[in-house]
């Protein structure tokens, strides 16, 4: 991870892009709706944002928190995304108001800036808890190349970050309880060791610009996750029968 942080520090600053005018405040700052690991202010700052102008809790109706961002099973099977849902469904989160340059740093830290971003930017209608009028905000949804057709349990490490951010933000007790009830991936010690070795290889390939060489292996892992034969599914999730996944909060 230190290698990656140093590599991030060597990157040239990004020029702010032209964003939809509806997500810009009168002073030109960007309204960004966070629902997953970016709920916590410190997490956003750690992504390169110099500062956060303001933060307030908000709801987005018609969308749900989903763990459909395909990553690297079995240690990190998925990250959070946001997916369409029935109109009565509410995704709780926070509105971070950022300078354009701070938002660009966050966007790049989430895989933006390249020819095939990991997330796509979408505009949602966020209703602040303060009672003020709903506002348009930009948020991130897993790009089609990363998007799974169903939720996959995230790692306990990642889920803990989301839950901690929800507590920090002061989201509703009922919503936090549903987050805490989500089953996390639990690979066996053997498979975890194999995956850690794979992770070190992935970091090395990333530094060399060759990370796409492992794409076929990642695809096989997700095929095993979805396989109807219990034996193959168990291999993919840690050689042990995985707990039945619980749905993300709606």
Located regions from the model:
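Glycine-aromatic micro-motifs
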Residues: 2-250
